[in-house]
Amino acid sequence: MSNLGKSTGSRKDTKMRIRAFPMTMDEKYVNSIWDLLKNAIQEIQRKNNSGLSFEELYRNAYTMVLHKHGEKLYTGLREVVTEHLINKVREDVLNSLNNNFLQTLNQAWNDHQTAMVMIRDILMYMDRVYVQQNNVENVYNLGLIIFRDQVVRYGCIRDHLRQTLLDMIARERKGEVVDRGAIRNACQMLMILGLEGRSVYEEDFEAPFLEMSAEFFQMESQKFLAENSASVYIKKVEARINEEIERVMHCLDKSTEEPIVKVVERELISKHMKTIVEMENSGLVHMLKNGKTEDLACMYKLFSRVPNGLKTMCECMSLYLREQGKALVSEEGEGKNPVDYIQGLLDLKSRFDRFLQESFSNDRLFKQTIAGDFEYFLNLNSRSPEYLSLFIDDKLKKGVKGLTEQEVESILDKAMVLFRFMQEKDVFERYYKQHLARRLLTNKSVSDDSEKNMISKLKTECGCQFTSKLEGMFRDMSISNTTMDEFRQHLQTTGVSLGGVDLTVRVLTTGYWPTQSATPKCNIPPAPRHAFEIFRRFYLAKHSGRQLTLQHHMGSADLNATFYGPVKKEDGSEVGVGGAQVTGSNTRKHILQVSTFQMTILMLFNNRDKYTFEEIQQETDIPERELVRALQSLACGKPTQRVLTKEPKSKEIESGHMFTVNDQFTSKLHRVKIQTVAAKQGESDPERKETRQKVDDDRKHEIEAAIVRIMKSRKKMQHNVLVAEVTQQLKARFLPSPVVIKKRIEGLIEREYLARTPEDRKVYTYVA
């Protein structure tokens, strides 16, 4: 037991010692290993590597590094590679400068890469240990650096390589076939020699390539511009861009695509934008004039590539559009047809909407420019609101031929686009009210649904305040229909006779309808006057405290008319009559649809054959302006509506002119509508002035109401801020001028709604 214990204890005290591996090698032995490796490297460079044992070479390199001779190995490698590249490779490349240069260089590069891969495999342990510990380039990269510095960047080789590549690309641009593979290999070599950077490729090739390209494209642009139209030029530039992109893809490094495309864009587009756009007989205006949507789309696509390209296009388009618009809305020459006027604007809008969709990709800048231009020229003509209302009036009247409800709806939607551009929406509202009243009172609306649909569009655009009176007009019409049913029932019950007059009365609420403040006088003939008095008594008995005032200018009548005279041709021979009801050999009966004023004039001729202008004026008491218009319609209108004749036969109505019934009148129609002269041409100048005065009066109240609303809320405001807020609130209806707003502020100060602050007269306070 004791022996075992001693033995155990003895084993415990004993320590094993491993002798360290000797880290030193005989210098002679080291040199022999290096000579072996050096010879192997040289054989690899000479492509005589078939007899080499890579395993043995790897072990030798491993041994040198392990025994701290890595530096000798690394330095020796650098010297051997450098010597080979200088003495063999560089010489071969220099000898080929004038013969197969690029192929020789590419072959040398490929051989060098192959050799360095093999050498790297042999010296793998040095890469893992010595290179890491000493923070030096690995074997493969060392080979790249030496090749870069001693071959590729060697004086004349570097220059010759750059020039060769540039010459080949220049030749290809001119249409020659070149060795794209050689270019691609050279560019790839330059990229690899940058050691994961672009510096070598960029400095030795890309920078001079871009400079050379800029000069080439500069010359090309001058040639293209001199020889081609705008559309052909654009196509050539597009082709050039695609060609350069394709060349980068197949020959150069992909990173060159962006800079070379920018050079093309700068030299072929940016520097010549104005010239391209303004080319005579082929530029932007020519394309717009001739509806060249595809060419415009090409120009848009090309110009969208460069800064301010689309802005340049927009400015040119805007000048042309404004010129076209101003020509359409010019106030030169009276008698412009409102329907044609608005249709012309709608056609122009449709054209540019088509360009916007098909050519300009619905681009926001173009959209805003077109809208701004339409707003500009539409508001140049003060008649635009009236004409737009007349246009809508024309589309909502009965008898619009060739249009379906959907087509009318589409036209009205387009009209609403113009309405949005209109600054004086309150003026439009006033005219729309007049024209709607005329349609409703003469039963000319195509349908209540169409009318209400249009009002709904206006309501959506401007709010219920804008349309409340229009909706009130419809309510009045509905109530009037009920009232007339009750009146007819009353006549049946009481047996009261209207003396052969078929009377229809519309009772209108003063605030809703465009009634005139001073109702024009008119001596209504006894028969219709008697019929109306019966209705008046009936109505006031039901609604005590109300007043009924006849609005003669809004009324209409159907008259039974008989013409007795023969109808003659210009040679004096008599002709037969069609369309009229013939009761005797030459007697013809028609129903004449006329205004109240026209009815009053015509019924005078039941008493006498002839009347002078003064006599008619005295008998009817119609205001002179209305009387002249009515007589012009009856005696100077179309031959198929000329129921009176006048002496002398002129279009003007003046004192002393004599009027008689035109017994030779005939028409193919039994019912003859006597059009009011210039009714479709809008208001006369005096009427327009009167309307404008009413609008200005309404605006005063609206501006004051807005000022009071704002000041009541804010209590205290500086003048300019208040003016800006008032403008903002009212711009949906009209644009008040700062001068007018200032006058209304002063008016409110005088009436003590507002007051100026003592310390600053440009600051106002609200007086509760």
Curated annotation (Swiss-Prot):
GO CC terms of this entry: centrosome; Cul3-RING ubiquitin ligase complex; cytoplasm; mitotic spindle; nucleus; polar microtubule; spindle pole
PTM summary: Neddylated. Attachment of NEDD8 is required for the E3 ubiquitin-protein ligase activity of the SCF-like complex.
Biased composition (Basic and acidic residues): 682-698
GO biological process, one term: positive regulation of mitotic metaphase/anaphase transition
InterPro entries xref list: Cullin, Cullin_CS, Cullin_homology, Cullin_homology_sf, Cullin_N, Cullin_neddylation_domain, Cullin_repeat-like_dom_sf, WH-like_DNA-bd_sf
Residue ranges that the Swiss-Prot or TrEMBL entry lists as coiled coil: none
Keywords annotated in UniProt: Cell cycle, Cell division, ER-Golgi transport, Isopeptide bond, Mitosis, Nucleus, Transport, Ubl conjugation
Pfam family membership, one: Cullin_Nedd8
Annotated crosslink Glycyl lysine isopeptide (Lys-Gly) (interchain with G-Cter in NEDD8) location: K712
Source taxon at top rank: Eukaryota
Region (Disordered): 677-698
Location of this chain's protein in the cell: Nucleus
Pathway recorded for this protein: Protein modification; protein ubiquitination
Main localization (coarse): nucleus
Annotated ranges, domain Cullin neddylation: 698-760
GO molecular function: ubiquitin protein ligase binding
Subunit structure: Component of multiple BCR (BTB-CUL3-RBX1) E3 ubiquitin-protein ligase complexes formed of cul3, rbx1 and a variable BTB domain-containing protein acting as both, adapter to cullin and substrate recognition subunit. Interacts with btbd6.
Described purpose of this protein according to its UniProt entry: Probable core component of cullin-based SCF-like E3 ubiquitin-protein ligase complexes which mediate the ubiquitination and subsequent proteasomal degradation of target proteins. The E3 ubiquitin-protein ligase activity of the complex is dependent on the neddylation of the cullin subunit. Involved in ER-Golgi transport by regulating the size of COPII coats, thereby playing a key role in collagen export, which is required for embryonic stem (ES) cells division. May play a role in the regulation of mittotic entry via ubiquitination of aurka.
Family stated for the protein in its record: Belongs to the cullin family.
Protein name stated in the entry: Cullin-3-A
Species per Swiss-Prot/TrEMBL record: Xenopus laevis
Source organism phylogeny: Eukaryota, Metazoa, Chordata, Craniata, Vertebrata
